[in-house]
């Protein structure tokens, strides 16, 4: 990566601005998944060990009007971070700018941390954070000593005041360890993979993955398709899909992708079908590709699991984004489990999960520790897989 990183700058005695991704699920004031906080610790600890004074920025959820602030304060995150760091984390509830915040920042000593309140509280008055208001970016940049560390891969595909805005107004904008690793794993996998390189794409909609499929058909040796989008590809070929999910307006796109794929695109050969999505009374495997009338496909079937297992044999690089079925339901998780197990058993494989539901599946189904890398950013990793330039990354200082 030809951008400066946190190791390229002198941090001692400096007020260092850091964009982290603490957008974690909070229920009744309790954090239900702290993975993103844990992922930011190496960068924060490094800054503190180097004698820097860390000023952290993050958003939490969507805030459009005053009422949305309820339950969106970063207060629980400040408490959780303090426990993880084993030291006090300064935090002023409800405050994203002003004299009180400036005084607290100026009072920081080397090795101390302050977390600014949810950056999206600034969205209440004209979406200043989300629309990258130039004055807000300039103001936040003025709170530090000319160094900005972006470690929020999860928002790197967005141009916000707290990442791109600050970057434009500091002497040096550098990557943190998490951002550096995310780019190294995902971009390298796509641009310079050890081959055979197999991509696996699941999820419900073809429309979400068109750009990714197109890019990966050029870069990968094989692209395996599963999940709900299977049925749009089926229908495009005239295969019966019963009541399965389909995007009627994407049938032409699916047909064009199949033609362009030249045999690289591998579809399931059977499904696990049910007679309803939720209150079903019958679940069975289809004979072949066709889904029975009155049924809908909710997972790939056993023949598909075997076919995908075979397609993955010998793979050296695997990128997986999107589950094979409705994995949250035990009746429809065999496909996702089967594919995960097929990936991780390959000797010497570099296995990467592109965030989102696939990451949740690996964690919930106990396979997370077997993968080389699990991305913290669903949308950002998708855009990297699509070959797009991420604004948050582009805004960093060149080496």
Curated annotation (Swiss-Prot):
- GO biological processes: gluconeogenesis; glycolytic process
List cystine links: none
Q: Which UniProt keywords apply?
A: ATP-binding, Cytoplasm, Glycolysis, Kinase, Nucleotide-binding, Transferase
Which SUPFAM superfamilies did the record assign?
Phosphoglycerate kinase
Q: Name one GO cellular component term.
A: cytosol
Give residues annotated as binding ATP: 209, 297, 328, 355-358
Name the InterPro entries on file: Phosphoglycerate_kinase, Phosphoglycerate_kinase_CS, Phosphoglycerate_kinase_N, Phosphoglycerate_kinase_sf
Assign the protein's first listed, main location to one coarse class: cytoplasm
Where do the annotations place substrate binding? 21-23, 36, 59-62, 120, 158
UniProt pathway annotation: Carbohydrate degradation; glycolysis; pyruvate from D-glyceraldehyde 3-phosphate: step 2/5
The terms under GO molecular function for this entry are: ADP binding; ATP binding; phosphoglycerate kinase activity
Catalysed reaction(s) here are: (2R)-3-phosphoglycerate + ATP = (2R)-3-phospho-glyceroyl phosphate + ADP
Where's it found, cell-wise? Cytoplasm
The record ties this protein, via Gene3D superfamilies, to: Phosphoglycerate kinase, N-terminal domain
- EC primary class: transferase
**HAMAP family for the chain:** Phosphoglyc_kinase
Query: Which protein family is named in the record?
Result: Belongs to the phosphoglycerate kinase family.
Protein name (record):
Phosphoglycerate kinase
* Source lineage: Bacteria, Bacillati, Bacillota, Bacilli, Lactobacillales
Q: Which gene encodes it?
A: pgk
